[in-house]
């Protein structure tokens, strides 16, 4: 959430920066609400001052033994008006809060301006796509004889669910363990295990609610709604909600492996085949909580940590910086990492790494105490390190062999009991 003081003092500038990301700020509505708020506050302050003055007059009249009934009647009337004004002011504050909650984050000045994904800018490519001397298959055709079972997934749960059996399930587990170990042992992240359901307050804190409720799976329980996590970013970032962190404890680095649940409400007809877009998928998530002046450097570092996984796996990839029109709601700056998929002859997203600035921290009231003893908002970052299912897809396609087997990348073999190849079953 943006600082309302920024809108009050730099409304036109904020509107222009938001326009660069395709969001039209209703400046007239905001100005009207602000003018109404100011008028109400001024009137309320005047009434309070008048009531205080009259109360003194009542006290003086009583000390002199004079009749104060007329003044008391006026005080009573002022009290009624004050209550009405306070109720109106509370309603106005609620409307201002609703307006603020719908406003996306301001893009950092280093973000390229663009209307949509066509405005994204490639930063670097790493690795050379393999040349095959046979007809490449996609991950479904490769994976089905190896234990990828979309049919049973559909029987159990419907479209966009998959069952993995035997060596495929083991490869999936190996990837997650490899990612966790790399980030915890080499990059200094603290591994955490979190709930897979969170309350609405947590979803609000990281920006999923109220704007993106249709993308979530809601679990009603009595009078309260819980939500299946769309990413471990939600529970992990909320660790610092309503907390004041010691400056000496920053930066905080957490890594978590969770299933993620998304309705894919806006993805009808896209990636319906295979594991690219699922309602349930696993992801290893990286979260950092840092001082404000460190957030952009931390984004470069976090992105590099995600890239390390692809480098160790020997998978070709590229990094792009998202333009203003393609950024996520709460993002200040985002790098997408895209892995090469031979069957699609293109790069596909496997990680998104973002600095959120103080956008989430303001919603969560997540602060740290600086050296001067002043409480300041922290900055938060998150990124996939990596999406496990899509990494499995990339391994299958990039390491496939003509006989239908798949070579296991060397770094995964210790997690696979030394297995060097996945072989078709039956």
UniProtKB/Swiss-Prot annotation:
Listed SUPFAM superfamilies: Class II aaRS and biotin synthetases, tRNA-binding arm
Stretches of the chain forming a coiled coil according to its record: none
Compartment(s) of residence: Cytoplasm
Positions of ATP binding: 262-264, 349-352
HAMAP family xref list: Ser_tRNA_synth_type1
GO CC, alphabetical: cytoplasm
Organism name: Laribacter hongkongensis (strain HLHK9)
Catalyses which reaction(s): tRNA(Ser) + L-serine + ATP = L-seryl-tRNA(Ser) + AMP + diphosphate + H(+); tRNA(Sec) + L-serine + ATP = L-seryl-tRNA(Sec) + AMP + diphosphate + H(+)
Keywords: Aminoacyl-tRNA synthetase, ATP-binding, Cytoplasm, Ligase, Nucleotide-binding, Protein biosynthesis
Comment text on domains: Consists of two distinct domains, a catalytic core and a N-terminal extension that is involved in tRNA binding.
Record-linked Gene3D superfamilies: Bira Bifunctional Protein, Domain 2, Serine-tRNA synthetase, tRNA binding domain
Lineage: superkingdom: Bacteria
Pathway: Aminoacyl-tRNA biosynthesis; selenocysteinyl-tRNA(Sec) biosynthesis; L-seryl-tRNA(Sec) from L-serine and tRNA(Sec): step 1/1
Name of the protein in its database record: Serine--tRNA ligase
GO molecular function term, any single one: ATP binding
Chain sites annotated for binding L-serine: 231-233, 285, 384
GO BP: any one term: seryl-tRNA aminoacylation
EC numbers on record: 6.1.1.11
Subunit-structure text: Homodimer. The tRNA molecule binds across the dimer.
Function in brief: Catalyzes the attachment of serine to tRNA(Ser). Is also able to aminoacylate tRNA(Sec) with serine, to form the misacylated tRNA L-seryl-tRNA(Sec), which will be further converted into selenocysteinyl-tRNA(Sec).
Pfam families: Seryl_tRNA_N, tRNA-synt_2b
Protein family per UniProt: Belongs to the class-II aminoacyl-tRNA synthetase family. Type-1 seryl-tRNA synthetase subfamily.
Cross-referenced InterPro entries: aa-tRNA-synt_IIb (IPR002314), aa-tRNA-synth_II (IPR006195), aa-tRNA-synth_II/BPL/LPL (IPR045864), Ser-tRNA-ligase_type_1 (IPR002317), Ser-tRNA-synth_1_N (IPR015866), SerRS_1_N_sf (IPR042103), SerRS_core (IPR033729), tRNA-bd_arm (IPR010978)
